[in-house]
Protein backbone atom coordinates (compact mmCIF):
# COMPACT_ATOMS: atom_id res chain seq x y z
CA UNK A 1 0.00 0.00 0.00
CA UNK A 2 2.84 2.41 0.77
CA UNK A 3 4.25 1.87 -2.73
CA UNK A 4 0.86 2.48 -4.32
CA UNK A 5 0.33 5.61 -2.21
CA UNK A 6 3.69 7.01 -3.30
CA UNK A 7 2.95 6.28 -6.96
CA UNK A 8 -0.52 7.79 -6.73
CA UNK A 9 0.94 10.95 -5.23
CA UNK A 10 3.85 11.29 -7.68
CA UNK A 11 2.13 10.02 -10.84
CA UNK A 12 5.56 9.48 -12.44
CA UNK A 13 6.20 9.34 -16.15
CA UNK A 14 9.79 8.15 -15.60
CA UNK A 15 10.76 5.82 -12.75
CA UNK A 16 14.28 5.07 -11.49
CA UNK A 17 14.41 2.19 -8.97
CA UNK A 18 17.47 2.56 -6.72
CA UNK A 19 16.12 0.99 -3.53
CA UNK A 20 18.14 -1.95 -2.20
CA UNK A 21 20.22 -3.20 0.70
CA UNK A 22 23.90 -3.46 -0.15
CA UNK A 23 26.18 -6.49 -0.06
CA UNK A 24 27.15 -6.50 3.66
CA UNK A 25 23.54 -6.12 4.79
CA UNK A 26 22.39 -8.89 2.42
CA UNK A 27 25.11 -11.13 3.85
CA UNK A 28 24.37 -10.33 7.50
CA UNK A 29 20.57 -10.13 7.22
CA UNK A 30 19.63 -12.41 4.30
CA UNK A 31 15.89 -12.58 5.01
CA UNK A 32 15.65 -8.82 5.27
CA UNK A 33 17.73 -8.52 2.10
CA UNK A 34 15.36 -10.86 0.29
CA UNK A 35 12.39 -8.85 1.53
CA UNK A 36 13.82 -5.52 0.38
CA UNK A 37 15.78 -6.39 -2.76
CA UNK A 38 13.50 -9.03 -4.28
CA UNK A 39 10.02 -8.66 -2.80
CA UNK A 40 10.24 -4.86 -2.68
CA UNK A 41 11.16 -4.80 -6.36
CA UNK A 42 8.37 -7.26 -7.18
CA UNK A 43 5.81 -5.13 -5.35
CA UNK A 44 6.95 -2.05 -7.27
CA UNK A 45 6.59 -3.71 -10.67
CA UNK A 46 3.23 -5.18 -9.61
CA UNK A 47 1.96 -1.76 -8.56
CA UNK A 48 3.11 -0.19 -11.84
CA UNK A 49 1.18 -2.83 -13.79
CA UNK A 50 -2.00 -2.72 -11.71
CA UNK A 51 -2.20 1.08 -11.58
CA UNK A 52 -1.62 1.46 -15.32
CA UNK A 53 0.70 4.40 -14.77
CA UNK A 54 1.55 6.56 -17.79
CA UNK A 55 5.19 5.48 -17.63
CA UNK A 56 7.48 6.37 -20.50
CA UNK A 57 10.58 4.73 -18.97
CA UNK A 58 11.51 2.38 -16.11
CA UNK A 59 15.17 2.09 -15.08
CA UNK A 60 16.34 -0.61 -12.66
CA UNK A 61 19.66 -0.13 -10.86
CA UNK A 62 21.50 -3.42 -11.26
CA UNK A 63 25.10 -4.29 -10.46
CA UNK A 64 28.24 -5.94 -11.76
CA UNK A 65 27.67 -8.32 -8.83
CA UNK A 66 25.62 -10.40 -11.29
CA UNK A 67 28.98 -11.38 -12.81
CA UNK A 68 31.64 -13.55 -11.24
CA UNK A 69 35.23 -12.67 -10.31
CA UNK A 70 37.11 -10.68 -12.95
CA UNK A 71 39.45 -13.63 -13.54
CA UNK A 72 36.59 -15.46 -15.27
CA UNK A 73 36.51 -12.93 -18.09
CA UNK A 74 38.88 -11.88 -20.85
CA UNK A 75 41.14 -8.87 -21.23
CA UNK A 76 38.29 -6.91 -22.81
CA UNK A 77 36.43 -6.92 -19.52
CA UNK A 78 32.88 -7.91 -18.72
CA UNK A 79 30.23 -7.50 -21.40
CA UNK A 80 26.46 -7.41 -20.76
CA UNK A 81 26.04 -10.66 -22.71
CA UNK A 82 28.64 -12.59 -20.68
CA UNK A 83 27.44 -15.46 -18.43
CA UNK A 84 26.07 -14.51 -15.02
CA UNK A 85 28.07 -16.07 -12.18
CA UNK A 86 27.42 -14.13 -8.96
CA UNK A 87 29.23 -15.19 -5.80
CA UNK A 88 26.86 -13.72 -3.20
CA UNK A 89 23.16 -13.23 -2.46
CA UNK A 90 23.26 -9.58 -3.51
CA UNK A 91 24.30 -10.62 -7.01
CA UNK A 92 21.65 -13.32 -7.30
CA UNK A 93 18.98 -10.88 -6.18
CA UNK A 94 20.09 -8.37 -8.79
CA UNK A 95 19.65 -11.12 -11.40
CA UNK A 96 16.12 -11.57 -10.09
CA UNK A 97 15.54 -7.83 -10.45
CA UNK A 98 16.75 -7.85 -14.05
CA UNK A 99 14.40 -10.74 -14.78
CA UNK A 100 11.47 -8.88 -13.27
CA UNK A 101 12.39 -5.77 -15.27
CA UNK A 102 12.34 -7.73 -18.52
CA UNK A 103 9.06 -9.44 -17.61
CA UNK A 104 7.57 -6.04 -16.74
CA UNK A 105 8.54 -4.67 -20.14
CA UNK A 106 7.09 -7.69 -21.93
CA UNK A 107 3.76 -7.25 -20.18
CA UNK A 108 3.54 -3.45 -20.20
CA UNK A 109 5.65 -2.53 -23.31
CA UNK A 110 7.13 0.34 -21.24
CA UNK A 111 10.75 0.94 -22.36
CA UNK A 112 12.83 -0.57 -19.55
CA UNK A 113 16.56 -0.51 -18.81
CA UNK A 114 18.67 -2.48 -16.33
CA UNK A 115 21.87 -0.49 -15.73
CA UNK A 116 24.76 -2.32 -14.06
CA UNK A 117 27.16 -0.42 -11.82
CA UNK A 118 30.59 -1.57 -10.72
CA UNK A 119 32.58 0.09 -7.91
CA UNK A 120 31.41 3.61 -7.10
CA UNK A 121 33.52 6.07 -5.10
CA UNK A 122 33.05 9.68 -4.07
CA UNK A 123 30.42 11.79 -2.27
CA UNK A 124 27.46 9.75 -1.09
CA UNK A 125 29.24 6.38 -1.34
CA UNK A 126 29.46 5.69 2.37
CA UNK A 127 28.21 2.11 2.71
CA UNK A 128 28.87 -1.26 1.14
CA UNK A 129 31.91 -3.51 0.85
CA UNK A 130 33.42 -1.58 -2.06
CA UNK A 131 33.01 1.78 -0.30
CA UNK A 132 36.51 1.22 1.09
CA UNK A 133 38.22 3.61 -1.32
CA UNK A 134 35.82 6.41 -0.41
CA UNK A 135 36.74 5.72 3.22
CA UNK A 136 40.41 5.88 2.22
CA UNK A 137 39.86 9.32 0.69
CA UNK A 138 38.20 10.47 3.92
CA UNK A 139 41.17 9.14 5.90
CA UNK A 140 43.49 11.28 3.78
CA UNK A 141 41.40 14.39 4.42
CA UNK A 142 41.21 13.77 8.18
CA UNK A 143 44.78 12.52 8.66
CA UNK A 144 43.63 9.16 9.99
CA UNK A 145 44.36 5.48 9.40
CA UNK A 146 42.18 3.22 7.26
CA UNK A 147 42.86 -0.38 6.22
CA UNK A 148 41.88 -1.49 2.71
CA UNK A 149 40.06 -4.84 3.08
CA UNK A 150 40.70 -6.23 -0.41
CA UNK A 151 43.03 -6.21 -3.40
CA UNK A 152 42.56 -6.79 -7.10
CA UNK A 153 41.26 -4.91 -10.10
CA UNK A 154 37.96 -3.04 -10.31
CA UNK A 155 35.98 -0.92 -12.72
CA UNK A 156 35.45 2.43 -10.99
CA UNK A 157 32.78 5.12 -11.32
CA UNK A 158 32.89 8.55 -9.67
CA UNK A 159 29.56 9.06 -7.91
CA UNK A 160 28.68 12.19 -9.89
CA UNK A 161 29.22 10.25 -13.13
CA UNK A 162 26.87 7.56 -11.83
CA UNK A 163 24.17 10.18 -11.38
CA UNK A 164 24.74 11.43 -14.91
CA UNK A 165 24.64 7.87 -16.27
CA UNK A 166 21.32 7.15 -14.63
CA UNK A 167 19.92 10.45 -15.87
CA UNK A 168 20.78 9.47 -19.43
CA UNK A 169 19.25 6.03 -18.95
CA UNK A 170 16.05 7.74 -17.86
CA UNK A 171 15.74 10.44 -20.53
CA UNK A 172 17.69 9.36 -23.63
CA UNK A 173 15.58 7.97 -26.51
CA UNK A 174 15.11 4.22 -26.11
CA UNK A 175 12.61 1.49 -26.95
CA UNK A 176 12.36 -2.12 -25.83
CA UNK A 177 14.29 -3.72 -22.98
CA UNK A 178 18.05 -3.59 -22.52
CA UNK A 179 20.82 -4.44 -20.06
CA UNK A 180 23.89 -2.19 -20.06
CA UNK A 181 27.13 -1.79 -18.11
CA UNK A 182 27.78 1.77 -16.98
CA UNK A 183 31.18 2.75 -18.46
CA UNK A 184 33.95 3.39 -15.97
CA UNK A 185 37.73 3.24 -15.61
CA UNK A 186 39.46 -0.03 -14.74
CA UNK A 187 42.56 -0.15 -12.55
CA UNK A 188 44.03 -2.11 -9.66
CA UNK A 189 43.56 -1.08 -6.05
CA UNK A 190 47.33 -0.48 -5.94
CA UNK A 191 47.04 2.00 -8.81
CA UNK A 192 44.11 3.76 -7.16
CA UNK A 193 46.03 4.09 -3.88
CA UNK A 194 49.10 5.39 -5.71
CA UNK A 195 46.94 8.11 -7.25
CA UNK A 196 45.54 8.98 -3.81
CA UNK A 197 49.06 9.36 -2.40
CA UNK A 198 50.15 11.45 -5.38
CA UNK A 199 47.22 13.85 -5.05
CA UNK A 200 47.63 14.05 -1.26
CA UNK A 201 51.29 14.99 -1.66
CA UNK A 202 50.40 17.71 -4.16
CA UNK A 203 47.86 19.10 -1.67
CA UNK A 204 50.30 19.00 1.24
CA UNK A 205 48.28 16.42 3.18
CA UNK A 206 50.06 14.04 5.55
CA UNK A 207 49.55 12.08 8.75
CA UNK A 208 47.31 9.46 7.15
CA UNK A 209 47.90 5.73 6.71
CA UNK A 210 46.20 3.47 4.15
CA UNK A 211 47.67 -0.03 4.53
CA UNK A 212 46.07 -3.28 3.44
CA UNK A 213 44.29 -5.27 6.13
CA UNK A 214 46.16 -8.45 7.05
Which positions does each model-derived feature cover?
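NAD(P)H-binding glycine-rich loop region in Rossmannoid oxidoreductase-like domains
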Residues: 2-36
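Conserved beta-loop-beta element that borders a ligand/cofactor-binding pocket
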Residues: 57, 62-63, 98-123
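Flexible, glycine-rich beta-alpha linker
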Residues: 67-68, 88-89, 113-131
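Active-site helix of classical SDR
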Residues: 89, 93-96
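Glycine/proline-rich active-site loop of Rossmann-fold NAD(P)-dependent oxidoreductases
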Residues: 95, 108, 121-134, 144, ...
Amino acid sequence: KSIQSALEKAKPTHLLHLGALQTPDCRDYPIRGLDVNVLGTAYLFKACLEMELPLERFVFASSSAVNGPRALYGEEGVRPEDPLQPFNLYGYWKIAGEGMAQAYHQESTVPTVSLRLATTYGPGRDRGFTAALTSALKAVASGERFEIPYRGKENYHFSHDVGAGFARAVIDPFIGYGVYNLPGQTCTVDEFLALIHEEAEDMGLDGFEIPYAE
